[in-house]
């Protein structure tokens, strides 16, 4: 009965993951803004990186401030900023308001990432259910990432390419609904010392070997995600001479497989020990990358790209859950640290570019394999001693 009540209370929290996926409209919308205002390729290319930038600068400070604000209030703040960001272009559509809107969407998303995951632990106290719920959250976010751009295209279809921002009333209404639902749901506030925390207090947690390894684990799983998405289309073009239209199919296979894998993981992690699931998936991921490197067949390579997405899909949630369970009394700071590591994952892309430029496309796959090998070390080398809150 208690678990049933927890799951009902968790629904508005899980719905917040749908809002989290809205930031992915930045990529598709920036193309239309560029045409309207004549932005350079450099300026337009900078826009999507705003999501990573705010993770880097806000992860730890927001994690520290959550001790004062409370997790639920911090989530509500993130949604308020997101709504303001969506209103700006509707009030005044120009280059400046679009840049400010993108910044607010990035800030809101970063704050939401830091606060929503630990808020889930307020209502889901069972460790196996927590990992499964975090995975379910990633599924919901993935669905949102697919739906968001479609809403942009819907607005363009009805109102024209210069009115792409008419998608914001729909996305803003969904965000407002999410905020009202969460506000109306009673969630017991987490216990907090109320002490003022500094950046050094949070970074000191990395002296704990387990937390350090898990921090790097987040870094590298984001690296695997970014790397596979980045390299998949390039690999198909280089190896098989696929056209621009054809290569778009490779990332789609990856994202679809990742979504299916996360959905399956949400069910299996309730029944299977998370470490066992982690280990099996990492071994399968290594095998997929080795086949990708050694076999030159377009169908086999597409299957391998999808397999990497499938087998790596639940790893973020598993590592995040392990970190929260290792030091639950420091959950807010842990969340800030882990989200900061998400920003660091963007470093992997330049490394892949360097590897491709030096030794060819296989060098890029090898960088991805190195990331997976580290995660395999985490799967077999970390022993989390779960402590009580």
Set out the residue ranges of the language-model regions.
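Central cavity-lining transmembrane alpha-helices of secondary-active solute carriers
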Residues: 46-64, 252-264
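Helix-breaking motifs and short loop linkers at transmembrane-helix boundaries and internal kinks
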Residues: 38, 70, 91-96, 241, ...
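Helix-loop-helix hairpin linking two adjacent transmembrane segments in secondary transporters
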Residues: 133-186
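Intracellular juxtamembrane helix-capping segments at the cytosolic ends
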Residues: 111-125, 313-328
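Cytoplasmic helix-loop-helix junction between adjacent transmembrane helices
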Residues: 101-139
């Amino acid at each position: 009965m208690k678990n049933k009540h927890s799951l009902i209370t968790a629904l508005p929290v899980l719905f917040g993951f749908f809002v989290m996926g809205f930031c992915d409209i930045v990529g598709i919308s920036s193309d239309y803004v560029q045409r309207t205002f004549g932005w350079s390729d450099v300026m337009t290319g900078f826009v999507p990186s705003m999501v990573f930038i705010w993770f880097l600068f806000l992860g730890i400070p927001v994690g520290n401030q959550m001790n004062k604000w409370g997790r639920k209030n911090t989530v509500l703040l993130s949604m308020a900023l997101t709504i303001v960001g969506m209103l700006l272009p509707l009030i005044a559509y120009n280059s400046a308001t679009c840049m400010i809107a993108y910044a607010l969407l990035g800030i809101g998303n970063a704050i939401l990432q830091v606060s929503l995951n630990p808020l889930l632990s307020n209502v889901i106290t069972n460790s196996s259910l927590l990992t499964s719920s975090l995975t379910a959250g990633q599924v919901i976010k993935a669905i949102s990432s697919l739906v968001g751009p479609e809403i942009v295209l819907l607005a363009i279809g009805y109102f024209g390419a210069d009115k792409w921002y008419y998608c914001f009333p729909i996305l803003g209404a969904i965000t407002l609904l999410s905020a009202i639902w969460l506000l109306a749901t009673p969630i017991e506030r987490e216990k907090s010392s109320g002490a003022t925390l500094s950046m050094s207090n949070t970074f000191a947690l990395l002296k704990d070997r387990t937390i350090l390894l898990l921090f790097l684990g987040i870094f590298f799983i984001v690296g695997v995600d970014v790397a596979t998405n980045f390299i998949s289309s390039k690999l198909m073009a280089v190896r098989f001479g696929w056209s621009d239209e054809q290569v778009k199919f490779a990332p789609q296979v990856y994202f679809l497989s990742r979504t299916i894998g996360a959905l399956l993981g949400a069910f299996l992690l309730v029944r299977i020990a998370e470490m066992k699931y982690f280990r099996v998936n990492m071994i399968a991921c290594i095998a997929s990358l080795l086949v990708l490197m050694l076999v030159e067949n377009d169908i086999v390579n597409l299957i391998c790209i999808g397999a990497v997405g499938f087998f790596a899909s639940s790893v973020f949630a598993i590592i995040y859950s392990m970190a929260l369970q290792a030091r639950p009394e420091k959950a807010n700071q842990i969340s800030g640290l882990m989200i900061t590591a998400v920003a660091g994952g963007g470093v992997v892309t330049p490394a892949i570019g360097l590897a491709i430029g030096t030794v060819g496309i296989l060098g890029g796959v090898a960088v991805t394999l190195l990331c997976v090998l580290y995660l395999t070390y985490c799967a077999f080398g970390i022993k989390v001693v779960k402590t009580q809150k």
